[in-house]
UniProtKB/Swiss-Prot annotation:
Gene Ontology terms for molecular function: cyclic pyranopterin monophosphate synthase activity
UniProt-listed PANTHER family: MOLYBDOPTERIN COFACTOR SYNTHESIS PROTEIN A
S-adenosyl-L-methionine listed as a keyword: no
InterPro entries in alphabetical order: MoaC (IPR023045), MoaC_bact/euk (IPR047594), MoaC_sf (IPR036522), MoCo_biosynth_MoaA/MoaC (IPR050105), Mopterin_CF_biosynth-C_dom (IPR002820)
Active site, renumbered: D128
Catalysis: reaction(s): (8S)-3',8-cyclo-7,8-dihydroguanosine 5'-triphosphate = cyclic pyranopterin phosphate + diphosphate
Name of the protein: Cyclic pyranopterin monophosphate synthase
GO biological process, one term: Mo-molybdopterin cofactor biosynthetic process
Cystine pairs: none
Keyword Lyase set for record: yes
Residues binding substrate: L75, C76, H77, M113, E114
Record note on quaternary structure: Homohexamer; trimer of dimers.
NCBIfam families in the cross-refs: moaC (TIGR00581), PRK09364.1 (NF006870)
Length: 159
């Protein structure tokens, strides 16, 4: 089994030194879902929500979250992201919203946490904007879909 990289030999948490790593193009995609009642989803789709455009707000929140991941997750490095994309898709057949994010950079460490944080915060923003009309929405699952670049190689979730 692979060792945890954020734990030193004394068992203490530390930020990984990436200075000796090669710069490569790194990309990660993640997804999250927000399940809700049909009426709540219809309000989002038809734009009648009193707080405004739910998808636009969630998209911006996800982008901002990716850029601030290093401030939220203690051992993440601050990164110079070159791409953050947040796609939101209403899925009326399932009474939910699907969020897919993509983060990219050329650097020495991966962007998995940035993609996951973007998806999570976009989902939380949808909840925040819609909680006045429905409090029992369900967020999840949130998961990494793909990652590429870096020493550990590529990853793709089995769908």
């Amino acid at each position: 089994m692979t060792q945890l990289t954020h734990i030193n030999t004394a068992g203490e948490a530390h930020m990984v030194d990436v200075s000796a790593k090669n710069e490569t193009v790194r990309e990660a995609r993640a997804e999250a879902f927000v399940d809700m009642q049909a009426a709540t989803l219809a309000m989002i789709i038809d734009g009648s929500h009193h707080k405004g455009d739910v998808f636009a707000t969630a998209r911006i929140a996800g982008i901002q979250a990716a850029k601030k991941t290093w401030e939220l997750i203690p051992l993440c490095h601050p990164l110079l992201l070159t791409k953050v994309e947040v796609k939101l898709e209403a899925q009326p057949e399932h009474n939910r919203v699907r969020i897919e994010t993509c983060c990219r950079l050329t650097g020495k460490t991966g962007v998995e946490m940035e993609a996951l944080t973007a998806a999570s915060v976009a989902a939380l923003t949808i909840y925040d904007m819609c909680k006045a009309v429905q409090k029992d929405m369900i967020i999840g699952p949130v998961r990494l879909l793909t990652k590429s670049g870096g020493k550990s190689g590529d990853f793709k979730v089995d769908i």
